[in-house]
Swiss-Prot record:
PANTHER family: CYCLINS (PTHR10177). It comes from Caenorhabditis elegans. This is G2/mitotic-specific cyclin-B1. The keyword Cytoplasm applies. Keywords: Cell cycle, Cell division, Cyclin, Cytoplasm, Mitosis, Ubl conjugation. PROSITE patterns: CYCLINS. GO terms for biological process: cell division; G1/S transition of mitotic cell cycle; mitotic cell cycle; oocyte maturation; positive regulation of protein phosphorylation. Residues 1-33 are annotated as: Disordered. Belongs to the cyclin family. Cyclin AB subfamily. The lineage of its organism: Eukaryota, Metazoa, Ecdysozoa, Nematoda, Chromadorea. Residues 1-13 have a biased composition (Polar residues). Interacts with the CDK1 protein kinase to form a serine/threonine kinase holoenzyme complex also known as maturation promoting factor (MPF). The cyclin subunit imparts substrate specificity to the complex. Interacts with E3 ubiquitin-protein ligase etc-1. It is found in: Cytoplasm. It holds the Pfam family Cyclin_C.
């Protein structure tokens, strides 16, 4: 049975959260204080940059908000054009419907593998982008039918190895990947599968994930000067959306759905089950449809499919890696918010969306 072993070897990787790498000759590693300053000299240098006459509070807050938005998008004036490009670019990578049909590996085998990969992803403290890219690589390889059932786990761990090289700053050593499979696969086998993956995909790994679209939609929905939103409530809603997006990774049916549609559906469902002051659900649907350039029927179809998949994958009791992951306080413990009543509401949303979509035809 696939499982991420608990006794992970001590790696050479250093935790970056509370320690800062000391430069050569500066002595041992030193804890970083709350402001990230290691020396008094650094503190004096930063204080020297502060203006002696600070701006009025309102002006300073407005300037800070603009700077934060600009830092988030790097080129705020082009944000809409970037989003449109991402929507156009994702069409290049759409998988065929029912790409898992016709032999082995089966959708059930894939679901078990993805659940195990989520466990490995959590154990290695990898970024969410790495997980999404891992599953994207896995599905593209499965569509090409170049991997047998016997090599499915090797394909999965090698896909994560490639994805971590693409997304991570501090990536695990290849021996960590060997160890996490309990030495079922050697370094040589992982490197050989890496070559197979890159050659089969022509080194093209740059598909935008649903997480990218979710962040864009979150920025758009939260920019409402007329009616400021409840940021704390929106944090919970955003994490519920992320959870729903990862539940979609478990099911091969969602692999042929555009990532922008998955992100839109996850945000609509999350706003319905966890409303946010300052954001009206109906208005949010209109904003999302306009931003996506899609009809309401297309979004309703995506909501119906994601609601059905999320309900099924969260309710089942065997593959619980994502459910356990979102019990973390770093992810707002949104698994605890997914009560039976909330899940039933999601299920009803899926059924209602199906009815609404059929009436629009």
């Amino acid at each position: 049975m696939l499982r991420a072993t608990n006794n992970r070897r001590t790696s050479n990787n250093v935790e970056k959260d509370s320690l800062q790498m000391a430069k050569h000759g500066n002595g041992p590693l030193k804890p970083v204080n709350a402001q990230g300053l290691q020396t008094k000299r650094e503190a004096r240098e930063i204080l020297a940059l502060k203006p002696s006459n600070p701006a009025p509070v309102e002006t300073a807050q407005k300037s800070q908000r603009i700077n934060l938005q600009d830092a988030e998008t790097k080129c705020l004036a082009m944000a809409d054009d970037i989003y449109k490009y991402l929507v156009h670019h994702e069409k290049k990578y759409l998988l065929e419907e029912c790409f898992m049909e016709g032999g082995e590996p089966t959708p059930k085998m894939r679901r078990i593998l993805v659940d195990w990969l989520v466990q490995v992803h959590v154990r290695f403290h990898l970024t969410p982008e790495t997980l999404h890219l891992t599953v994207f690589i896995l599905d593209r390889m499965l569509q090409k039918k170049v991997t047998s059932k016997a090599d499915l786990q090797l394909l999965g761990i090698s896909a994560m190895f490639v994805a971590s090289k693409f997304e991570e700053v501090y990536l695990p050593d290849i021996h960590d990947y060997e160890f996490i499979t309990e030495n079922t696969y050697s370094k040589k086998q992982i490197l050989a599968m890496e070559q197979t993956i890159l050659n089969s995909l022509n080194f093209d790994l740059s598909c935008p994930s649903s997480l990218v679209f979710l962040r864009c939609l979150s920025r758009i929905l939260s920019e409402n000067d007329a009616s400021p939103i409840d940021n704390q409530a929106f944090c919970y809603t955003y994490n519920i959306s992320k959870c729903l997006g990862e539940l979609a990774l478990l099911d091969s049916v969602m692999a042929s759905t555009p990532r922008s549609h998955i992100a839109s559906a996850s945000m609509i469902i999350a706003l319905e089950v966890h409303p946010v002051d300052g954001i009206e659900a109906e208005n949010a649907v209109s904003v999302i449809c306009k931003q996506l350039g899609a009809s309401k029927k297309v979004i309703e179809d995506a909501v119906a499919l994601l609601a059905e998949v999320s309900y099924k994958n969260f309710k089942q009791g065997k593959l619980v890696a994502i459910k356990n992951k979102y019990q973390s306080s770093k992810l707002a413990q949104v698994s605890n918010l997914m009560t039976d009543d909330v899940l039933e509401k999601i299920n009803r949303m899926g059924q209602n969306a199906k009815v609404d979509a059929s009436e629009m035809e």
